[in-house]
Design a protein with these regions (language model features):
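Structural signal for well-ordered, non-membrane alpha-helices
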Residues: 16, 50-51
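Charged alpha-helical initiation segments
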Residues: 1-44, 56, 67-69, 73-77
Protein backbone atom coordinates (compact mmCIF):
# COMPACT_ATOMS: atom_id res chain seq x y z
CA UNK A 1 0.00 0.00 0.00
CA UNK A 2 1.34 3.44 -0.91
CA UNK A 3 1.70 6.01 1.80
CA UNK A 4 -0.52 9.10 1.68
CA UNK A 5 2.60 11.28 1.38
CA UNK A 6 3.90 9.32 -1.62
CA UNK A 7 0.51 9.59 -3.32
CA UNK A 8 0.51 13.34 -2.64
CA UNK A 9 4.07 13.79 -3.90
CA UNK A 10 3.25 11.98 -7.15
CA UNK A 11 0.15 14.10 -7.71
CA UNK A 12 2.05 17.28 -6.86
CA UNK A 13 4.86 16.47 -9.31
CA UNK A 14 2.27 16.04 -12.07
CA UNK A 15 1.13 19.59 -11.24
CA UNK A 16 4.68 20.78 -11.85
CA UNK A 17 4.31 19.56 -15.44
CA UNK A 18 1.36 21.92 -15.87
CA UNK A 19 3.52 24.75 -14.55
CA UNK A 20 6.23 23.93 -17.08
CA UNK A 21 3.64 23.71 -19.84
CA UNK A 22 2.34 27.14 -18.90
CA UNK A 23 5.84 28.62 -18.93
CA UNK A 24 6.53 27.17 -22.37
CA UNK A 25 3.21 28.12 -23.97
CA UNK A 26 3.20 31.64 -22.54
CA UNK A 27 6.70 32.23 -23.91
CA UNK A 28 6.25 30.57 -27.30
CA UNK A 29 2.56 30.54 -28.19
CA UNK A 30 1.06 33.66 -26.61
CA UNK A 31 -0.14 35.03 -29.96
CA UNK A 32 -2.34 32.01 -30.68
CA UNK A 33 -3.07 30.49 -27.28
CA UNK A 34 -4.20 31.92 -23.93
CA UNK A 35 -2.06 29.89 -21.56
CA UNK A 36 -3.76 31.25 -18.41
CA UNK A 37 -6.14 28.29 -18.60
CA UNK A 38 -3.18 26.05 -17.88
CA UNK A 39 -2.52 28.00 -14.67
CA UNK A 40 -6.13 27.47 -13.63
CA UNK A 41 -5.78 23.76 -14.33
CA UNK A 42 -2.62 23.68 -12.24
CA UNK A 43 -4.38 25.24 -9.24
CA UNK A 44 -7.28 22.80 -9.56
CA UNK A 45 -4.83 19.90 -9.74
CA UNK A 46 -2.93 21.11 -6.65
CA UNK A 47 -6.14 21.43 -4.61
CA UNK A 48 -7.09 17.97 -5.84
CA UNK A 49 -3.70 16.61 -4.70
CA UNK A 50 -4.34 17.96 -1.19
CA UNK A 51 -7.86 16.50 -1.20
CA UNK A 52 -6.51 13.11 -2.28
CA UNK A 53 -3.81 13.23 0.41
CA UNK A 54 -6.34 13.85 3.20
CA UNK A 55 -8.68 11.15 1.85
CA UNK A 56 -5.87 8.61 1.76
CA UNK A 57 -4.48 9.62 5.16
CA UNK A 58 -7.89 9.38 6.84
CA UNK A 59 -8.80 6.08 5.16
CA UNK A 60 -5.50 4.40 6.06
CA UNK A 61 -5.51 5.66 9.65
CA UNK A 62 -9.17 4.66 10.15
CA UNK A 63 -8.29 1.16 8.99
CA UNK A 64 -5.38 1.14 11.45
CA UNK A 65 -7.78 2.13 14.26
CA UNK A 66 -10.12 -0.68 13.20
CA UNK A 67 -7.21 -3.14 13.28
CA UNK A 68 -6.22 -2.00 16.77
CA UNK A 69 -3.01 -0.29 15.71
CA UNK A 70 -4.07 3.24 16.65
CA UNK A 71 -6.12 4.67 19.48
CA UNK A 72 -9.79 5.31 18.84
CA UNK A 73 -11.03 8.91 18.57
CA UNK A 74 -14.31 10.49 19.62
CA UNK A 75 -15.35 11.19 16.04
CA UNK A 76 -14.24 7.73 14.88
CA UNK A 77 -16.60 6.21 17.46
CA UNK A 78 -19.48 8.13 15.89
CA UNK A 79 -18.66 7.12 12.31
CA UNK A 80 -21.66 5.13 11.02
CA UNK A 81 -21.03 1.66 9.64
CA UNK A 82 -24.08 -0.15 8.20
CA UNK A 83 -25.22 -3.35 9.87
CA UNK A 84 -24.74 -5.26 6.61
CA UNK A 85 -21.06 -4.27 6.52
CA UNK A 86 -20.51 -5.27 10.14
CA UNK A 87 -22.23 -8.59 9.44
CA UNK A 88 -19.80 -9.19 6.57
CA UNK A 89 -16.88 -8.25 8.84
CA UNK A 90 -18.01 -10.72 11.51
CA UNK A 91 -18.99 -13.54 9.15
CA UNK A 92 -15.95 -13.28 6.87
CA UNK A 93 -12.88 -12.74 9.06
CA UNK A 94 -10.48 -13.34 6.14
CA UNK A 95 -11.81 -10.29 4.28
CA UNK A 96 -12.78 -8.11 7.24
CA UNK A 97 -10.11 -5.46 6.66
CA UNK A 98 -10.93 -5.16 2.96
CA UNK A 99 -14.67 -4.96 3.68
CA UNK A 100 -14.17 -2.26 6.30
CA UNK A 101 -11.71 -0.32 4.12
CA UNK A 102 -14.09 -0.39 1.16
CA UNK A 103 -16.94 0.97 3.29
CA UNK A 104 -14.77 3.73 4.74
CA UNK A 105 -13.66 4.77 1.27
CA UNK A 106 -17.22 4.64 -0.03
CA UNK A 107 -18.40 7.02 2.69
CA UNK A 108 -15.35 9.29 2.59
CA UNK A 109 -15.65 9.50 -1.19
CA UNK A 110 -18.66 11.74 -0.73
CA UNK A 111 -16.58 14.22 1.28
CA UNK A 112 -14.27 16.89 -0.06
CA UNK A 113 -11.22 17.97 1.87
CA UNK A 114 -10.59 21.31 0.21
CA UNK A 115 -11.20 23.76 3.06
CA UNK A 116 -9.56 24.08 6.45
CA UNK A 117 -12.84 23.11 8.16
CA UNK A 118 -13.36 19.97 6.10
CA UNK A 119 -9.71 18.97 6.50
CA UNK A 120 -10.02 19.40 10.27
CA UNK A 121 -13.18 17.25 10.25
CA UNK A 122 -11.28 14.50 8.45
CA UNK A 123 -8.34 14.68 10.85
CA UNK A 124 -10.72 14.44 13.82
CA UNK A 125 -11.70 10.97 12.58
CA UNK A 126 -8.14 9.79 13.24
CA UNK A 127 -6.82 12.11 15.95
CA UNK A 128 -8.15 13.79 19.08
CA UNK A 129 -5.64 16.63 18.75
CA UNK A 130 -7.27 20.04 19.18
CA UNK A 131 -7.56 21.83 15.84
Amino acid sequence: MSTPKLIFDNAWSRCDLLSLTYAYTSANMSAVFDSREILRAEWVARVSALDLYIHELVAQKMLAIFQGGRPCTTKYDKFPIPHSVMSDVINNPHTRDQTYDLEIRRQLGIQTYQTSESIADGIRLISDVTL
